[in-house]
Amino acid sequence: MSADLVALLYLAAGVLFILALRGLSSPETSRQGNLFGMVGMAIAIVTTLAYHPPADLGAWGLVVLGLAIGASTGAVIARRVPMTAMPELVAAFHSLVGMAAVLVAAGALYAPAAFDIGTVGAIHTSSLIEMSLGVAIGAVTFTGSVIAFLKLSARMSGAPIILPARHAINIALAAAIVALIVFFARTESHLAFWLLAFAAFAFGVLIIIPIGGADMPVVISMLNSYSGWAAAGIGFTLGNSALIITGALVGSSGAILSYIMCKGMNRSFISVILGGFGGEVAGPAAGKEQRPVKQGSAEDAAFILKNAGKVIIVPGYGMAVAQAQHALREMADRLKKEGVTVRYAIHPVAGRMPGHMNVLLAEANVPYDEVFELDDINSEFGQADVAFVIGANDVTNPAAKEDPSSPIYGMPVLEVWKAGTVMFSKRSLSSGYAGIDNTLFYRDNTMMLFGDAKKMTEEIVKAL
């Protein structure tokens, strides 16, 4: 296969990956986006094997074995992992990309001739720089993603873990990583390579553990970006333009998404990375006097909903925890049969990963044309008879609009309080990730529905 044909095929794969990203940006075209991505990846793999065929039968066996293991594992995951576990699954996949970057860099260090980058002890300087950057980014991505996976899957506390003098430790470790990159690029020291890898592994842990569970959408986007740049680093080491293109696409899209997520929380990217914000708060904000709230039953809610003309449902992380999306869809179907107009309002940072609520609603087969983003539906709350909030706390807090002293002041929120009646399904009056009371709880037009979100929604369905 000629180099020109390979370049053309890699370009075609890159275009398909761009189309995949475009398709995955909307639920209506997500299946098409997945198909584009699959075809692009197939072209890239076949082209690579044809241009650099394994040297012997044993090498072919390893390639086939690797493909079989990867394909079968992917198939099992696709069939068995529930949609509610998508955030931790995404984090786990990011970790694999990071570790792949580390292993490829290690392979290039010990067998440079196989990568056509020189010989042992005489590797090209440019390749050493690429390898050092690849292993640093890859190692940070791996351990950072593992910590994110543990937090998201509740195998580790989602609250921030604050170490004494953590900023000084991180600065010192970052400086050591930079120094090791320079030293390795100048000396090709194997010891420096592994010290760099372990320093980056530690750095990945230290920058993620102080980040609270509710900041995970930004973390997932950030790790997505890291994994892309790690893949691009692998591409440079392997001399594979398709991998460079793909890595750059993932890296840049992840960075853009991180910016969008930060904007949606009215936070700076640096403030998220510095951590210490986003911890789970077990009870009402400390020092706050308990205020009376209106509490309703499932029967009360069903009566009001049934007689409403327009209902806007606002899902949040509480829906994901309770896995209430199917019950919510059933409730919406019952209301539509009664002639009620039903819409869903999604905040960009609701949940624990970008698009978390969209994924869960799609799993419950909620029609795409009923789901709206914040900017598209905020103006409709004033015309809604009922806003049904299910586990969306800080993203519905009026303090973001009305209280300049609030930590979340200026954060874009869903203006649910403008609806005729607000129904808030929640276990208790506990604070959200910002650690502040939601003043929505105490408004005259708010009715609290205490209890498990799924059970409460199912009881409302029965009452309907």
Q: Where are the regions a protein language model picked out?
A:
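Structural signature of hydrophobic alpha-helical transmembrane segments
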Residues: 1-14, 54-72, 127-142, 188-199
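Transmembrane helix-loop junctions at the membrane interface of multipass transporters and ion channels
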Residues: 107-121, 186-191, 218, 225-245
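C-terminal ends of transmembrane helices
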Residues: 16-29, 71-90, 145-160, 203-216, ...
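Structured cytosolic domains appended to multi-pass membrane proteins
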Residues: 289-464
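Alpha-helical transmembrane segments in multi-pass membrane proteins
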Residues: 14-18, 36-48, 62, 66-70, ...
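Membrane-interfacial segments at transmembrane helix termini in multi-pass membrane proteins
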Residues: 249-308
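Transmembrane alpha-helix boundary signature
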Residues: 48-64, 76-85, 102-120
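Cytoplasmic-side transmembrane-helix entry/capping segments in multi-pass membrane proteins
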Residues: 31-40, 63-65, 85-97, 160-171, ...
